[in-house]
UniProtKB/Swiss-Prot annotation:
Gene3D superfamilies: 2.40.128.20. InterPro entries: Calycin, Fatty_acid-bd. Belongs to the calycin superfamily. Fatty-acid binding protein (FABP) family. It comes from Caenorhabditis elegans. It comes from the Eukaryota. CDD domains: FABP. This is Uncharacterized protein EEED8.2. Disulfide bonds: none annotated.
Length: 299
């Protein structure tokens, strides 16, 4: 007997092959063998139906799980879409904040630039005020400050201890003549002193003006300063990597006359000057403080 593939309830009985009974086995009747085969088939069919039912239950569970996974996936996709929208909104807000910050930064830079200009203007005004105060105090340290009284042209009228002074110097007779008949011109302001030296007669065409800045020596070591209402000139030279003062001149104005005390090579010479009208040659040319001559010992 065999099971039809189109129906699980209809059976067809086919004759079984006759087998020879084995030794020791009792022979069975055909009716009993047919009943046993039908019972086995029914049990197998029942088992298949149970398995089919289990498979159907499993399929239903898988379908249910699939639906739940689909819902979860849709929820995840929805959340991702919402996150994308939030990120887009956040990016737009960030761009707006960046634009606002950039605008504020430009405004701050403009304010800083304006403040810097105001600061420079204020500093300039303050420096100008302090310079004015300093200049006024510079000229008001004494009742007759040397900075004002020495300005003008002076001519030698008296000289003391000149022979001893001349003997101690390495100068020519020509320079000695200049020292005896020298005219000096001074013009002092806050930071500098202008000087001019010339012979009253033969040196007028070669008169020369020099500019010296207070407390700054020139290339020849000539340094002007004001000490105790006196105009001081010191000349230094380097010897064995050390600076040595080789000449010092103190000038002061007393009773309308300029008194000069000049010390050089350990010997002192004193000269007295009187103020005279300006007789400098108009052809005289200004010179830098770095153009002095090495023989300029009579300043």
């Amino acid at each position: 007997m065999s099971l039809d593939s189109n129906s699980d309830t209809e059976f067809e009985l086919v004759p079984k092959f006759q087998t020879q009974p084995t030794r020791g086995d009792a022979p069975k009747s055909p009716e009993l063998e047919e009943v046993s085969t039908v019972s086995d088939l029914q049990d197998e069919l029942k088992s298949l139906r149970l398995e089919n039912k289990d498979l159907y239950s499993l399929m239903e569970q898988l379908k249910k799980d699939n639906d739940e996974m689909k819902k979860s996936l849709e929820k995840v996709m929805k959340n991702q879409a919402e996150l994308g929208e939030l990120e887009e909104i956040r990016a737009i807000e960030d761009d707006k904040r960046s634009e606002k910050l950039a605008t504020e930064l430009v405004a701050i830079r403009a304010d800083c630039s304006s403040l810097n200009r105001s600061e420079r203007e204020c500093r300039y005004d303050i420096e100008r005020i302090f310079a004015k105060l300093e200049e006024e105090s510079f000229f008001s340290l004494h009742e007759n400050p040397i900075q004002r009284t020495i300005s003008g042209t002076w001519k030698v009228i008296k000289i003391s201890n000149f022979d001893e002074f001349f003997a101690a110097q390495d100068i020519s007779q020509f320079h000695a003549l200049i020292i005896k008949n020298q005219c000096l011109y001074f013009k002092v302001n806050k930071h500098q002193v202008k000087t001019q030296s010339y012979h009253e007669r033969s040196w007028k065409p070669r008169a020369r003006e020099e500019i010296h800045y207070f407390n700054f020596p020139n290339s020849l070591g000539e340094l002007y300063s004001v000490e105790k209402n006196k105009l001081i000139l010191t000349v230094t030279q380097e010897e064995n990597d050390k600076k040595k003062v080789i000449s010092r001149v103190e000038r002061s104005v007393v009773d309308g006359q300029m008194k000069e005390i000049w010390e050089r090579n350990g010997v002192i010479c004193e000269r007295i000057f009187k103020k005279i009208p300006d007789q400098r040659d108009s052809r005289a040319y200004p010179r830098s403080i770095y153009g002095s001559e090495s023989q300029n010992i009579y300043y």
